[in-house]
Regions:
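Short, cationic low-complexity segments
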Residues: 95-110, 119
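Acidic/polar-rich alpha-helix caps and helix-coil junctions
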Residues: 1-89, 113-311
Length: 311
């Protein structure tokens, strides 16, 4: 109510960090999803999509996720050369600069994309990562610098696709199965290559819910939702060891492509820090309060005693 519906934040990319009425409703939809308030999540996601139902084209999706002017972006941050980059983590998402590109994808995860899904094309290049130039992993082509010479780009904070997924999940819990399928299918069809049709959604019951959760992983990969979804849905991290022969392709400044055989690897960490297997509801999924903060803030546990779970 404090943000007028007609409030205009501006159209310049540097204005997209401001929260307008649509973004506020998106935040409410996201918050309600996390709180398992399904009707509120459904209502606000629906209102956002009434204002902006747009979903990216294939060309836009493959352009690097680096432009706040993208019609699907509801909220974003546009970095400039004048900004401080002390915590500018986008540097580690772009594979094109030597010493960076450490945000890699699980080779097994890519198998979840349909062959006609153009998102799958973004996870096909094996190459050397930031870790000393010796480790070969499956790199991501989803994120790219807008200005590679200066290492800056725009970063998305909220997209309409998230609203489709919130609406689909909320509809499922509200027992609107047909609508949940319809909303989910709308997003899946939008991610098919030109002339291709998304497979019919035949899943029912818990299988339909799992299909919605999987689509969140496929659509929002690398955008910061995975750990929250694992916690709220009481799921477990799933990782398998991967090591096998792969082909690395490199292109020089003249466009000549050379290939090299190498041994590709997947995750290094396959268990928790204490050596136990991954499981739901682990304390390792939670962000911890730094020890110095606990020592210096005498009132930290004044009203709520520190649980043994966190010791």
């Amino acid at each position: 109510k404090l943000i007028p519906e007609k409030y205009n934040r501006g159209t310049d990319p540097t204005d997209y960090y401001k929260i307008n009425h649509t973004v506020a409703m998106g935040i409410l939809a996201r918050t309600a999803l996390y709180a398992r308030d399904w009707q509120t999540a459904y209502d606000y996601a629906s209102k956002v999509l009434e204002k902006n139902p747009y979903l990216m084209t294939e060309a836009e999706y493959k352009s690097g996720f680096n432009n706040c002017n993208n019609g699907e972006w509801l909220w974003g941050y546009s970095a400039t050369q004048d900004d401080s980059d002390g915590a500018y983590t986008m540097n580690f998402k772009d594979k094109s600069l030597d010493g960076y590109g450490s945000l890699c994808v699980d080779p097994y995860f890519v198998e979840n994309y349909h062959d006609n899904d153009y998102r799958k094309d973004l996870f096909q290049d094996w190459g050397y990562t930031a870790q000393g130039g010796k480790v070969v992993r499956l790199l991501n082509s989803k994120f790219a610098f807008q200005d590679i010479d200066n290492g800056i780009t725009d970063m998305d904070l909220m997209r309409t696709s998230e609203m489709y997924l919130i609406k689909a999940e909320a509809a499922y819990y509200l027992h609107n199965t047909d609508e949940a399928k319809s909303v989910l299918y709308t997003l899946q069809q939008a991610r098919m290559k030109e002339g291709k049709t998304a497979p019919e959604i035949t899943a029912t019951g818990e299988d339909l819910l799992k299909a919605i959760w999987l689509e969140r992983r496929l659509e929002l990969w690398g955008e910061g939702f995975a750990i929250t979804d694992i916690i709220r849905n009481q799921q477990s991290i799933e990782r398998k060891e991967f090591e096998g022969p792969v082909i690395i392709k490199e292109e020089d400044e003249e466009g000549n492509i050379t290939t090299e055989e190498a041994t590709g690897t997947g995750h290094d960490v396959l268990k928790f820090n204490d050596g136990t297997d991954f499981c739901p509801n682990s304390k390792y999924y939670l962000y911890r309060i730094p020890l110095n903060e606990e020592l210096q803030n005498q009132n930290l546990y004044k009203n709520h005693e520190k649980l043994d779970f966190y010791r």
